[in-house]
């Protein structure tokens, strides 16, 4: 069996990239419902739901891009330094695509 690097998995995983991008736009800390709500407002990103955020969370935690904090029953997603750096770059790329190239989905 061939091992696929986390980099390739991240590029293929649009939900993981979406969660990172939305967390960066939400100041690096948010609950799952806040991430889903922010995703619905953009209308250009893939649609998220609780299961998709949970699947993305597993990958992002494993690769140290986010950390999970618990406040009672709520799970708070927090970007790590690596995740914040990657989120900032993704945000710059998305702004370039939307504003300068005027691409639409």
Enumerate the predicted regions with their spans:
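A short, conserved structural fragment
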Residues: 61-71
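Short alpha-helical segments that sit at the start of domains
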Residues: 1-26
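Basic, amphipathic "hinge/linker" alpha-helix immediately C-terminal to the N-terminal HTH DNA-binding motif
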Residues: 72-90
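Amphipathic alpha-helical dimerization/coiled-coil segments
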Residues: 3, 84-105
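DNA-binding alpha-helical recognition surfaces that contact promoter or target DNA
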Residues: 21, 37, 55
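Short helix-capping/hinge SLiMs at alpha-helix to coil transitions
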Residues: 24-28, 42-43
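Short acidic, hydrophobic short linear motifs in intrinsically disordered regions
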Residues: 29-40
